Amino acid sequence: MFVSDKFIFNGIHSDEMGVALITFDSNVLNKYGLNFNRGISLDKGGGDMSHFVQDGDNIEEIELNIVLIGSGFTPMAWDDETIMHITSWLITDSFVEFISEDNIDLTYYLKTTKIVKHFNHNKEGYLQVTLQPFSNCAYIKYSKKYTFDNPNSFTIKNVSNLNEMYKPILQIKNLGDASNIITIENTTVEGEPFVIEGLDLNEVVQVDSLLGTVYNDKNENLLMKCNRKWLKLAKNENVINVSGNVEIDIKCQFPVIL
């Protein structure tokens, strides 16, 4: 599944926990990343290709084998305290970040569903961990902050290899008074610009373009202060025009299929 034996799970590096990934594959080639699996079914209304319909993505569980290691990558015997410590780290209530040192720019979101202990009589062995991915994608994170006091523009590249529009999260800080009108427009795609106004001086709002929500740092709903024309990013380069006295932090997690 992953080539490197080192990884980060839920913000903690495997070295800190004294564990590593192992594989039992004897071949030179091993599986890498997540499998892509999408079902296609036949519409009963017809028999040619135009009558095939796409089902939802089939998200397959993955298995990772985790061994306890000492200095020099020497496998160690487990004890009950260590088992509890490691399983407590691996079992989470929600999907959490997984980053393999194969490529630290790729983030996966996984949730542990099963742990099986494979030990001999000396408790030497490994944990077989089954995890459910959030999706069939890895994600490339992007975050950049811009400050404008005059109309200006910037370029952002949607690096996803999916043919879908991406809707980012915008953190907007109003640097003017309540009369300041903030406009954000993607000139690369058709559609109206996103407009928000009536914010207090230095008020910060988070705009989730996918969920269609606008909240300030007091968790107050400010949806009524925008026109609900959410920013969308096309694949590849996008030129974004901005007007108003504003600080914008644009945050993306572009999905990629490997």
Locate predicted features.
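Short, solvent-exposed beta-alpha or beta-beta edge segments that form flexible loop/patches at the rim
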Residues: V28-N65
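Oligomerization/assembly interface segments of phage tail-like spikes and tubes
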Residues: S50-P75, K123-C137, N238
